[in-house]
């Protein structure tokens, strides 16, 4: 059974499950070079911010991308 969990579940760029705007799909016919203009050291987030972000994300809604690009569990 397939499920679309809506905007509360985003399963990544290669997955159609739960996209906010499913009609807007990124397509490209030509290879575009990536240009990096500057380099900076990686910023580390404080542990309390990482924990708060994990609690408020998709996992808090009980929705993640399962096998076959379906929302798992399908409780939307």
Swiss-Prot record:
Coiled-coil residues: none
Alphabetical UniProt keywords: Metal-binding, Metal-thiolate cluster
GO terms of molecular function: metal ion binding
Role noted for this protein: Metallothioneins have a high content of cysteine residues that bind various heavy metals.
Family from the record: Belongs to the metallothionein superfamily. Type 15 family.
Protein name: Metallothionein-like protein 1
Species: Zea mays (Maize)
């Amino acid at each position: 059974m397939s499920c679309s969990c809506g905007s509360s579940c985003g399963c990544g760029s290669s997955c159609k499950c739960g996209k906010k705007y499913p009609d807007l799909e990124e397509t490209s016919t030509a290879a575009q070079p990536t240009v990096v203009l500057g380099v900076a050291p990686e910023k580390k987030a404080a542990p309390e911010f990482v924990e708060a972000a994990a609690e408020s994300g998709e996992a808090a809604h009980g929705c993640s991308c399962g096998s076959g690009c379906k929302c798992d569990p399908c409780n939307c």
